[in-house]
């Protein structure tokens, strides 16, 4: 009887696995079929970047009439209207002389299935785009963010003829695109401490992320070099800004989060602690370990990596205060800060909150009698224990106020046996840590320096494109890979070279993270990426040529 | 009696000259005095870039109340309202918590003296800005363009305090600025043939020129590599564009001219001829000399410098057609083009029209029997005679349709004895040609390559700043120096590195051309330029650091 039951269970498992396998195979086969139907090669498909999950394309073309509009056939929202209007203005910048007829495309039906606009980890970005003829063309999304992604695809399909002043879609109709991202977390990290970026520049970055179908801006807002974040609970912190004008106000942060929402981009804040804290001390000198910059000691503390001193009576209050303030909760630690009406974010702030944890230079604590006394009192034996205790407090506080903590891999390396499983680990050194962390049940975000850091002279789109974040991760753990990020560490980057460092390398990461793995290869990526780059340039996003440097000689953007 | 009369005339001349000298001296002295009053050094003055013609500054500060507005005390115009609204939004991007009182600045009176909005060479950009207290602060301009320049100065005076959410003007009140440009022609040349720049990018360039108090965009629109200009009279010319989407439509050009007007920037078109014409021939192959690319001949024609063939029956009709079409006249040479309703520019196009004339490679004509036969028929002995005859026809046609021809110095070198004096010569090789041209009575624009071309690796702001366009020009000819231009030749420049090549070098040129010569020295330029660069970055104009390259390490924009 037991054996029979076991056999039935076994049979069921086999059936389920086979079913999944067949379904997946059909999906893959369908896709591949559609790519090759009528002897069309991949290169004959319209150059959509990142490539969609599923696409089926015919050979017909259609003119778009001057009466063309988006026709909402579902309930509408303010954000949906704003999005449609934005893309209408992006697409139709020229005169259109084509009168509507039964042979022209006069409308695209828009079907928004849910009015839920909450932007949080895993939000729905899927969409379905069908273009056949005038009556049967539609764009469907579960959320307005799916509609945004679909409109970006629609934008990329439309061309303009300067000779007869007409818009058209060429050689790909009827068209069915069923699209959704491969990974839920796809972003770029921007460091605004080493150089300050104006709000206008950050908004332009957000806009550009949306064109790439990214969904997250990881904002590494402060670091050792400057503290540009204006805090109401600890107003002296901005004394650590580069200058009196290189600062982000509440008003600025609200604009950035609002613009993120309008572009389907989560704004994930990082307040890096306890390392990289020199800038904190300009306003509150007691935050740093005593004697850290004593020039007479043999063990030197690196100037820009000095960490907070966990034994300082200010360290926890200020750290907790910042977490509360910038996650929009009312757990404020500062008794002077009880103006709830000025609560910054409410529901708009992301559910992931990054607290750094990288590169804690323990030797900086070595000169401080205060720390050593405090270690004795608290029964902490090593500086590693000090770091661990501090970080655990931060993590627990974040969990208490309802946020999911994200930390750089150093934290995992330091004490993964005691690290809560809710923590998401961001990998930047090596894939081996990704394997190790997932084997230990941690969710990870991939941002491995030699592939996805964007500031190096050797960074380029092919290198970035070829890195697969699930590499050597066991199949049962692949669901723990949440996605990845390109990173703009800004020692050698400021506004003047930001976009040429961001793109096209980040665009390659965008496709790696959005498109099916069997599509993400170099087969026809280059020409599609060149086309996509042209579409970025057209919209004022100043991507470098594919050589990742400056232009070598006169060329079309389609060959650069 | 005759001697007496002569003496009286002589005396009068002496009195007038003395009068001018004394007046100028007083003006200079006043300015210098104001710079040193109360032992204030130049560096204590507010960091306005480019420095104003006359400024007088006190030591007081003032808060700007949240009720602040621009109050028009004269007649108004749509453009004036749009300009005030633009600067209001540029300045007031943050919360302002300051209530109005008798001690705050609550308004700036705006006095527009003339509604004349015609943008042409020499238009009035002067303004007077007085800020004392709430009742006696005003900005006065003869034209709306003077108001624009004054608002830019006002913008640069205002700071924000992130600690108490207030706007203020610091340590310089009462303030009187009497400002006007030193030269009437101050611009940047943009080459859109070697790389195509999107309309959005060109609009951003125009916006940036206005912040620099430039007044001209010299648009080198076509060249050998591509022909992005969509012509209704000769529609096949756009076959020479890089691609079917790297083209400027009428609609685009109108947007660019309209935006120029909104920023006080003349859009001066250049249609370079007869050299650099390879791209013309894609649509009209017969325009080029027969046999130009014959590989068997010993004298080679450089691929990208092949000129038009003046003996082609198409050369003059197409050249004249383009001049007519793009200067908005109705002297169209193409009988098929008589749609006057589609006239492009009407009054909005600039009165200066550039027709190139540089680098005509005569040897490219050497293989063509057609040219040689035609030379015999027309009694032309040398290829130089061919070029001269063609250019004279172009110049006369331009004068006939009411435009002032501008040509590169090659034309002056080729036949200055027969060149009409109406022609403006743009100098790019050497100051000696500037001296020679002015000695021969020609007006010049200075754009000498080794100082004011912006694409070289050695280009930098100090080099550009130190070049004085009137150098060694005799005093009696200085009025013939109309101004100058920084030049973006785009073989190695595209949208991705455009702004870091444009700025800060062009900003240095902007001050050289706007500010009094006795002020234009390196004394306090660096810190003012750094401040100005910060103000550009804030507005999304991504100037390189002052090293003209990428950032060397983490820094404030005020030290970069």
UniProtKB/Swiss-Prot annotation, chains A, B:
Residues 1-25 form the signal peptide. It is an enzyme of class 3 (hydrolase). GO terms for molecular function: beta-N-acetylhexosaminidase activity. Coiled coil: none annotated. It comes from the Eukaryota. SUPFAM superfamilies: (Trans)glycosidases, beta-N-acetylhexosaminidase-like domain. CDD domains: GH20_HexA_HexB-like (cd06562). This is Beta-hexosaminidase subunit B1. The gene is hexb1.
């Amino acid at each position: 009887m037991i054996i029979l039951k076991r056999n039935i269970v076994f049979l069921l498992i086999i059936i389920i696995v086979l079913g999944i396998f067949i379904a997946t195979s059909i999906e893959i086969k369908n896709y591949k079929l559609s790519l090759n139907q009528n002897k069309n090669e991949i290169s004959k498909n319209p150059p959509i970047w990142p490539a969609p999950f599923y696409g089926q394309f015919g050979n017909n073309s259609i003119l778009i009439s001057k009466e063309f509009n988006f026709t909402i056939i579902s309930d509408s929202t303010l954000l949906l209207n704003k999005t449609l209007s934005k893309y209408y203005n992006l697409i139709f910048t020229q005169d259109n002389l084509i009168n509507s007829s039964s042979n022209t495309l006069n409308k695209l039906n828009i079907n928004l299935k849910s009015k839920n606009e909450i932007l949080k980890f895993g939000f729905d970005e899927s969409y379905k785009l069908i273009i056949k003829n005038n009556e049967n063309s539609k764009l469907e999304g579960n959320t307005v963010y799916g509609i945004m992604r679909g409109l970006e695809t629609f934008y990329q399909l439309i061309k303009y003829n300067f000779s007869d002043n007409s818009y058209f879609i060429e050689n790909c109709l009827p068209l069915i695109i069923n699209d959704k991202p491969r990974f839920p977390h796809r972003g770029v990290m921007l460091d605004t401490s080493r150089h300050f970026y104006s709000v206008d520049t950050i908004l332009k970055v957000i806009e550009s992320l949306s064109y790439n179908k990214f969904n997250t801006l990881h904002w590494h807002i402060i670091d050792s070099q400057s503290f540009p974040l204006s805090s109401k609970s600890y107003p002296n912190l901005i004394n650590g800004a580069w200058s009196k004008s290189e600062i982000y106000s509440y008003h600025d942060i609200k604009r950035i989060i609002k613009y993120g929402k309008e572009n389907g981009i989560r704004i994930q804040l990082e307040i890096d602690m306890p390392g990289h804290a020199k800038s904190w001390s300009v306003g509150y000198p007691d935050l740093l370990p005593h004697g850290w910059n004593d020039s007479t000691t043999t063990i030197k503390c690196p100037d820009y990596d000095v960490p907070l001193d966990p034994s300082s009576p200010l360290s926890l209050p200020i750290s907790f205060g910042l977490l509360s303030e910038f996650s929009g909760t009312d757990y404020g630690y500062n008794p002077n800060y009880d103006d709830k009406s000025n609560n910054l974010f409410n529901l708009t702030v992301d559910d992931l909150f990054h607290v750094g944890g990288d590169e804690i230079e323990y030797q900086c604590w070595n000169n401080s009698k205060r720390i050593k006394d405090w270690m004795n009192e608290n029964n902490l034996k090593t500086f590693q224990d000090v770091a661990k205790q501090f970080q655990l407090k931060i993590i627990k506080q974040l969990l208490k106020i309802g946020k999911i903590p994200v930390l750089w891999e150093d934290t995992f390396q330091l004490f993964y046996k005691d690290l809560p499983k809710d923590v998401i680990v961001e990998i930047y050194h090596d894939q081996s840590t990704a394997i190790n962390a997932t084997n230990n049940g941690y969710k990870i975000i991939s941002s491995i320096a030699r592939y996805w850091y964007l500031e190096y002279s050797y960074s380029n789109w092919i290198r970035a494109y070829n890195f697969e974040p699930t590499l050597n991760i066991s199949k049962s753990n692949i669901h723990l890979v949440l996605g990845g990020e390109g990173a703009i560490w800004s020692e050698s980057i400021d506004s003047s070279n930001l976009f040429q460092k961001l793109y096209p390398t980040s665009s390659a990461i965008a496709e790696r993270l959005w498109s099916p793995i069997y599509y993400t290869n170099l087969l026809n990526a280059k020409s599609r990426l060149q086309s996509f780059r042209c579409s970025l340039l057209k919209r004022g996003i100043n991507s470098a040529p594919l050589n990742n440097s400056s232009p070598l000689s006169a060329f079309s953007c389609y060959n650069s």
